[in-house]
């Protein structure tokens, strides 16, 4: 059972503006979990009986372990666990981070519960993976829960609180990784530990992989799969991705999603050349000026809208879920548009009316983000070169990356700009475009799998007034090695968020609601329950 709230947690939740729904939409635990926790069964609990055993009889394989209290109550509290995770600075500046202390802490959590663990070393010192394996009762292919421990760096001066303190303010827990994705990790781990604490067993092995180098680096999940596939081979995978969206008030659950496809990630480099000279005699052909004009031209341009079967299903569910009639009407206009100009007009209206405009714009088209700019080296010298990197994400089944690249080159033609596709060393542009085409053509994960059915049923039980849908993830995950082998993978961030929290992902003051985390942990508990023996 969950540990009692800390004083800070109680104080902040009392002042929280989180909306709780009425009868039937409270997100309370189901009957078995209630029985497990209730004082009415305290005597039976002392004898090693769990809530499941009260309904279905004992499970002798783990009853003794559960009765012995092998799970620390603090480890089944997702807030307590998340605070510990956030206290470790696992920043990844581009070539991995120091994930060992975080892995050792989490290893201790699993060890206390009697779960087998292994820290997998990589060639980079202290940049490690952690694998925990909960043994199942059959030889069915395992369920893999995939959650990265590394996070992007912070701009400390722009945070309201210490990003490594796990502080709770006004019902929200702040910290780098609170949303992406230590929050999801804490929900998954604490939910599994609740099952173990009950003496529960699973009908297949459950592997929990806390990976490194998801944000960047050479030794992430692909390296791990190449070196140690036997440790992470699975029949299905759950990771980050699907958003739990709220109605316009920002807290009432509206749409629960599980992603089954990621956008296609690639980068473009724009280079400008100009006359280098003394800064006292500026010229219109300066490289920085030329690059700035090109960026200005591109930043005002949107790639065309492309709807795929995955995004059509998502937006149809969104139209049904929202309580905003004007927004629903705009979505239906988009879905029913018969020409490209009509789709573009409807998309503009839909995005303008959305409470999550940047998310919904990203699901429609290839996006461009200007992330790195380099030029100049001395204040009295006009440099001869300038460079900007553009991070791009293409819709699978929409516009091909090669066609987008051609469109960008066409937009800046005649501006003295070179556009290059960033690619791995030793790979030609043609070869890399072929690789991107292959990723672009990867089919979405099947909807008819035990994991997707478990996600759907957990959503219905935990958020009965919200809709559930599959979705496209606008970003990327560590799922590539499994998807390339035809293994279905899905993603969730199991907590309802508002748009401000979504924008803070990889930004400043990253945070999630404490109540949403707890309710999301109940969602994860119910999802794992579908795999109980």
Language-model region placement:
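Active-site metal-coordination/substrate-binding segment of hydrolases
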Residues: 140-210
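N-terminal helical capping/dimerization or prosegment-like subdomains
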Residues: 64-156, 385, 389, 401-403, ...
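N-terminal secretory signal peptides
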Residues: 1-30, 57
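Hydrophobic, small-residue-rich alpha-helical packing segments that form membrane-like cores
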Residues: 210-236, 240-252
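Solvent-exposed loop/turn segments at secondary-structure junctions
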Residues: 92-93, 125, 138, 149-153, ...
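C-terminal region of N-terminal signal peptides and the immediate post-cleavage residues
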Residues: 50-66
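N-terminal export signals
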Residues: 35-54
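Metal-dependent amide/peptide-bond hydrolase catalytic core
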Residues: 64-67, 243-519, 525, 529-532
């Amino acid at each position: 059972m969950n540990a009692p709230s800390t004083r800070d947690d109680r104080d902040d939740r009392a002042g929280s503006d989180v909306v709780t729904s009425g009868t039937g939409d409270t997100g309370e635990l189901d009957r078995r979990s209630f029985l497990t926790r209730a004082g009415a069964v305290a005597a039976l609990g002392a004898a090693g009986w769990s809530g499941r055993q009260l309904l279905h009889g004992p499970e002798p394989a783990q009853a003794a372990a559960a009765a012995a209290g092998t799970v620390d109550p603090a480890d089944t509290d997702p807030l307590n666990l998340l605070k510990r995770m956030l206290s470790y600075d696992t920043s990844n500046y581009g070539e991995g981070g120091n994930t060992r202390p975080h892995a050792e802490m989490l290893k201790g959590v699993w060890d206390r519960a009697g779960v087998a663990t292994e820290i997998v070393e990589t060639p980079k010192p202290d940049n490690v993976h952690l694998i925990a394996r909960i043994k199942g009762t059959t030889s069915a292919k395992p369920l893999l829960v995939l959650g990265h421990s590394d996070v992007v760096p912070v701009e400390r001066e722009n945070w309201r609180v210490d990003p490594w303190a796990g502080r709770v303010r006004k019902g929200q827990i702040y910290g780098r990784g609170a949303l992406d994705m230590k929050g999801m990790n804490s929900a998954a781990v604490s939910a599994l530990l609740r099952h173990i604490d009950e003496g529960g067993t699973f009908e297949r092995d459950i592997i929990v992989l806390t990976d490194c180098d998801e944000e960047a680096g050479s030794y992430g999940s692909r390296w791990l799969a190449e070196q140690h596939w036997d440790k992470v081979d699975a029949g299905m995978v759950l990771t980050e991705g699907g958003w739990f969206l709220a109605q316009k008030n920002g807290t009432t659950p509206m749409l629960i999603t599980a992603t089954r496809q990621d956008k296609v990630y690639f980068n473009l480099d724009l280079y400008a050349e100009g006359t280098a000279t003394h800064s006292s005699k500026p010229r219109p052909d300066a490289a920085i000026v030329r690059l700035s004009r090109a960026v200005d031209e591109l930043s005002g341009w949107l790639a065309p809208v492309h709807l795929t079967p995955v995004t059509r299903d998502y937006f149809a569910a969104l139209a049904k879920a929202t309580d905003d009639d004007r927004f629903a009407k705009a979505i239906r206009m988009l879905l029913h548009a018969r020409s490209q100009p009509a789709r573009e007009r409807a998309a503009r209206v839909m995005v303008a009316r959305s409470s999550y405009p940047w998310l919904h714009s990203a699901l429609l088209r290839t996006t461009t983000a200007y992330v790195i700019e380099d030029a100049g080296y001395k204040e009295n010298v006009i440099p001869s070169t300038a460079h900007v990197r553009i991070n791009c994400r293409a819709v699978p089944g929409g516009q091909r990356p090669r066609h987008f690249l051609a469109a960008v080159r066409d937009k800046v033609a005649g501006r003295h700009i070179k556009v290059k596709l960033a690619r791995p060393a030793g790979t030609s542009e043609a070869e890399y475009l072929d690789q991107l085409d292959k990723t672009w053509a990867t089919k979405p994960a099947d909807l008819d799998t035990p994991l997707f059915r478990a996600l759907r049923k957990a959503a219905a039980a935990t958020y009965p007034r919200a809709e559930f849908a599959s979705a496209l993830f606008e970003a990327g995950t560590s799922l590539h090695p499994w998807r390339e082998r035809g293994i279905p993978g899905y993603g969730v961030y199991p907590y309802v968020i508002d748009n401000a929290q979504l924008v803070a992902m990889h930004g400043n003051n990253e945070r999630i609601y404490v109540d949403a985390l707890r309710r999301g942990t109940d969602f994860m508990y119910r999802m794992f329950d579908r795999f109980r023996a």
